[in-house]
Curated annotation (Swiss-Prot):
PROSITE patterns membership: MTTASE_N, MTTASE_RADICAL, RADICAL_SAM, TRAM
List of residues binding [4Fe-4S] cluster 2: C172, C176, C179
One matching Pfam family: Radical_SAM
Keyword terms of this UniProt record: 4Fe-4S, Cytoplasm, Iron, Iron-sulfur, Metal-binding, S-adenosyl-L-methionine, Transferase, tRNA processing
Record protein name field: tRNA-2-methylthio-N(6)-dimethylallyladenosine synthase
GO (cellular component) term, any one: cytosol
Catalytic EC class: transferase
Gene name per UniProt: miaB
Residues at which [4Fe-4S] cluster 1 binds: C26, C62, C96
Organism: Desulforamulus reducens (strain ATCC BAA-1160 / DSM 100696 / MI-1)
Length: 456
């Protein structure tokens, strides 16, 4: 049963205090950062982008890949001088990396100037832990070994005013052999549907047009309930919310994307026609070693069923190369899968060892081979992405305007329902408007277009 967040301590600070949160990793971490920011602003802190101005710096960490951990350790080393110059600065490390016992100990040992270390299960305790650091003038290390339910009503400070992340569940039960997430995020816990619905209704009242439902495996939503309420039921309920324009969700596990869910996403008016379905590999032998729980044939049949019901569906994926034991034949099967599915885009990455996972004990593929394979995969996917986007030329697509582009204030950018980035001229259109855009040029990573007068 959800408990209410009570540790606000609103008057503990004054408005001159500044905070900086630096997040690494996935959308779940981005959403956690919004909660961290919300709690800090409840304490009277204001955001800053300058490290030297901050009174508190939180590093919200990731441990899915070694590169993310290396970035954190490098940043901590550089922050040492700032901590010496500003001894009252509170420096904290949280998130998935600090949830690992070995990593937390390493931080404590190598960076003793860190004031605060906590994990993924107790971020709602942040106000109390800050108060403890200030009152006792000593470091606080609190990493809960296990999750203790879901804490609702944590303050949230969102950067975006049009699109919002909404977490619907936490944790993962899948235990893929390469992945550390179940060990640092805990077992699956679903939020109550009424809490999710209420949050989205409040967002709509605040002017938000689009929500993305988040979970390590959203398709597992509700499996921990005693009743039969599942993800498809939640989507139908959200689709009925007045004023909401678009609904997205991620991430989906291909094994759990069943026929009922396909029927719901095909019929729901607000659920966007974009499905992120991480394949990871195209070889049955590798998929089995990964403990993915499905075969290549199952995956391809799922894609066929989705496109049969949603012909204009955009499919994206995560694809890994260099899993331990992957042969050239295995890799060729991944390339063939990409050719058959024709992903609109894919997040491609090289396997790297995660201590504590079963795959870490297997015979590894050489770095040279992994580097060569990832380049071949990227080249293939870039070509397919370009071809897919060129097919959009001449079509008129609905675009949610997000604002000016970063490089040219005369150009606006937005997203189609299939999550394709569109750039166009149209200074009279305000962020949040839905406009009709005729696509004039397809590029590998975006579409160029022009506003259709009167939407016709």
């Amino acid at each position: 049963m959800a408990e209410k967040h009570q540790d606000k301590m609103t008057n503990a600070m004054n408005n001159s205090k500044l905070y900086l949160i630096q997040s690494f990793g996935c959308q779940m971490n981005e959403r956690d950062a919004e909660s961290l920011a919300g709690m800090l602003e409840d304490l009277g802190y204001c955001p800053t982008s300058a490290q030297e101005e901050a009174d508190i710096i939180l590093l919200n960490t990731c441990c899915v890949r070694e590169t993310a951990e290396s970035k954190v350790f490098g940043l901590l080393g550089r922050l040492r001088k700032l901590k010496v110059a500003k001894p009252d600065l509170i420096l904290g490390v949280c998130g998935c990396m600090s949830q690992q016992e070995d990593a937390a100990k390493r931080i404590r040992r190598s960076f003793p100037f860190v004031d605060l270390i906590f994990g993924t299960h107790n971020i709602h305790e942040l106000p109390r832990m800050i108060h403890q650091v200030q009152e006792n003038h000593e470091a606080v290390l609190e990493v809960w070994a296990t999750e203790k339910g879901i804490t609702e009503s944590i303050p949230v400070k969102r950067k975006d005013k049009l699109k919002a992340w909404v977490t619907i569940m936490y944790g993962c039960n899948n235990f893929c052999t390469y992945c550390i997430v179940p060990y640092v995020r805990g077992r699956e816990r679903s939020r109550q549907p009424e809490d999710i619905i209420d949050e989205i209704k409040e967002l709509v009242q605040e002017g938000y047009k689009e929500v993305t439902l988040l979970g390590q495996n959203v398709n597992s939503y509700g499996k921990d309930f005693k009743n039969n309420y599942r993800f498809a039921d939640l989507l139908m309920a959200i689709d009925d919310i007045t004023g909401l324009e678009r609904v997205r969700f991620m991430t989906s596990h291909p094994r759990d994307f069943d026929q009922r869910l396909i029927e719901v996403v095909a019929s729901a008016k607000k659920v966007c026609e974009h499905y992120h379905l991480p394949a990871q590999a195209g070889s049955n032998r590798v998929l089995k070693m990964m403990n993915r729980g499905y075969t290549r044939e199952h995956y391809l049949e799922l894609i066929r069923k989705i496109k049969e019901r949603v012909p204009n569906a955009s499919i994206t994926a995560d694809l890994m190369v260099g899993f331990p034991g992957e042969t050239e034949e295995d890799f060729q099967e991944t390339l063939d899968l990409v050719k058959q599915v024709r992903y609109d885009s894919a997040f491609t990455f090289v396997y790297n060892i995660r201590s504590g996972t079963p795959a870490a004990k297997l015979e590894q593929v050489s770095e040279e081979v992994k580097s060569e394979r990832i380049q071949r995969l990227i080249e293939l996917q870039n070509l397919i992405s370009l071809e897919n986007n060129q097919r959009e030329e001449g079509r008129v697509l609905e675009v949610l305007v997000e604002g000016e582009t970063k490089t040219n204030p005369d150009l606006l950018a937005g997203r189609t329902r299939t999550n394709k980035l569109v750039v166009f001229q149209g200074s009279g259109h305000l962020p949040g408007q839905l406009v009709q855009i005729r696509i004039t040029k397809g590029r590998p990573n975006l579409l160029e277009g022009e506003v259709v007068p009167n939407g016709t």
